[in-house]
Amino acid sequence: YKLYRGEEVRGATPRFWEDVKEGEALPVMFKGPMTVTGFIAYAQGWGGLYIRANKLAWRLIDAHPGVGIANRFGIPDVPERVHWEEEFALEVGAPGAYDYGPERSSWLMHQMTNWMGDEGFLRQADCKIRRHNPAGDMLFIRAKVTKKYKEGDRHLVAIAQEAHNQ
């Protein structure tokens, strides 16, 4: 957790387009170590696609029977439990309980908004999720400016990012 101390947040200090250089590296962003508690905390904030309890869970499974996958008690449960239930994650071929892809996408944007500051505007972002980040993993996000250009009156930069575990 000590790696979070070094996180650079530009905030209200403007980053001027004229000062940006092609090839410039952004500060490395650290995320982790991955924990099941962290996976659940993300699901609490996001809401999850299928995470419901009690009567709401019954309504979902009753309306969409294929959503429910029997747990160890034979009760239909959500597929998202691969994120907090180690045995189920292993059963489906994952290396263990693992993080959420949308959260990982948000980390990439977090790095860019920290770098650009409050006055910047994130115009476009896309990413590819290629592997799981199981509990215990630590993630390091590296990025660099690949292009600096103008489109009409817009002053833009393109940034390439890669995230790797320990």
Q: What is each stretch, according to the model?
A:
Residues 111-112, 128, 144:
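Short, hydrophobic/aromatic alpha-helical segments in well-folded domains
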Residues 13, 124-130:
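Short structured motifs
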Residues 1-119:
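Hot-dog-fold acyl-thioester-processing enzymes
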Residues 1-8, 12-22, 28, 41, ...:
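HotDog/MaoC-like acyl-thioester-processing domains
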Residues 116-122, 150-151:
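Phosphate-handling active-site elements
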